[in-house]
Amino acid sequence: MTTGQDALYTNSTLALNPQTGQVEWYFQHVPGETLDLDIVYERVLIDADGEQWLFTIGKDGILWKLDRRTGAFVDLRETIYQDVFETVDQTTGRLEYRQDIRDAGVGSRVAACPSLLGGHNWQASAYHPDAGALVIPLHQACMYLTGRDVEFVEGGGGTAGRWELREMPGTNGNV
């Protein structure tokens, strides 16, 4: 898989009909994700001003806003410094990796923010309706990631990538 391939339904939000199990709609946040910056955490459902929204945030630190009735992209916000996407289309929500990430191969060392620990990770977000506040735990660190050969054997698993934490710009030495 490359960053140019979709790998359908990975890093996606899916709405399933509970009676039939059929997919009602889906939105793929990051097609071809390759840096372990997946969008796999909670979906927060918010009703406000007569609208029904779905918010989610993943390891890339991008907060997504979708129409929860249709799955249509509404908006996104970068909540922390990120430099893995050279294109962040505010109209369509389409992201494009930097060229050096798209070209990286086994043995290539890539600098990336945030790290694979994630801008957001397993600590759940929460919505406070009285305050109108969405509270999101964030992690601010960057990484160097080097791809290594992987021997595919039954029961093996893992990517075998080597990664090192590094300081995120603007964090004043705090990792």
Show where each model-derived region lies.
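Long, low-complexity segments enriched in small/aliphatic residues
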Residues: 93, 100, 108-111, 117-143
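Extracytoplasmic/lumenal domain signature
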Residues: 2-39, 46-51, 62-112, 142-175
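Repeat-blade elements of multi-bladed beta-propeller folds
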Residues: 1-2, 12, 37-58, 121-126, ...
